[in-house]
């Protein structure tokens, strides 16, 4: 992985006490929302929970849904949303999500289970890309692709 990239060291996905789904992502080093800025026309960075529903497998199909965070307009906070993947088109925003940064190394996504259609379980992967990077060596995944985690909700 490229120096200065977002290096994922720990991921936890499950249900919060308030009933929402929660993904907590910890990086190897401290980072800030400004690290997701795309400067001078470069693309912004993001941290995304990739979700596969039903029998879809991460090794053979694109994710069904993305829950992504990126830098907010004030450049100091994070914003997030749930997006549904569409064949041959850009993802469609389907629900709100929240993103917080409780520590210097960790960010947390929260969203309603109904945003995914209330599945009994799903497979997931996390990907993180620092702002301004178009290269694959800037992308980190957890678990390491093509592996995935699994969450049972019922």
Regions found by a protein language model. Name each.
Residues 7-12, 22-26, 106-110, 121, ...:
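Ser/Thr- (and often Asn-) enriched beta-sheet segments in non-cytosolic proteins
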Residues 33-37, 92-93, 119-122:
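A short, polar/proline- and glycine-enriched secondary-structure boundary/capping micro-motif
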Residues 1-77, 131-135:
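Surface-exposed, glycine/proline- and aromatic-rich loop segments on solvent-exposed faces
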Residues 142-154:
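Short, low-complexity, Pro/Ser/Thr/Gly-rich segments in the mature regions of secreted, periplasmic
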Residues 79-119:
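Acidic, glycine-rich flexible loop segments
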Residues 18-20, 44-48, 97, 104-108, ...:
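Extracellular structured ligand-interaction cores
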Residues 102-145:
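Ser/Thr/Pro-rich, low-complexity mucin-like regions
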């Amino acid at each position: 992985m490229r120096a200065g990239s977002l290096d994922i060291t720990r991921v936890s996905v499950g249900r919060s006490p308030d009933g929402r789904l929660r993904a907590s992502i910890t990086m190897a080093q401290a980072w800030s929302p400004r690290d997701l800025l795309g400067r001078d026309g470069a693309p912004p960075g993001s941290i995304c929970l990739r979700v596969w529903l039903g029998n879809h497998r991460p090794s053979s199909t694109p994710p069904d849904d993305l829950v992504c965070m990126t830098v907010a307009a004030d450049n100091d906070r994070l914003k997030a949303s749930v997006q549904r993947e569409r064949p041959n088109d850009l993802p469609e925003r389907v629900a709100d999500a929240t993103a917080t940064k409780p520590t210097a190394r960790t960010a947390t996504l929260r969203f309603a289970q109904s945003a995914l259609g209330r599945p009994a379980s799903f497979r997931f992967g996390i990907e993180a890309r620092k702002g301004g990077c178009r290269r694959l060596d800037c992308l980190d995944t957890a678990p390491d692709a093509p592996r995935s985690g699994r969450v049972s909700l019922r």
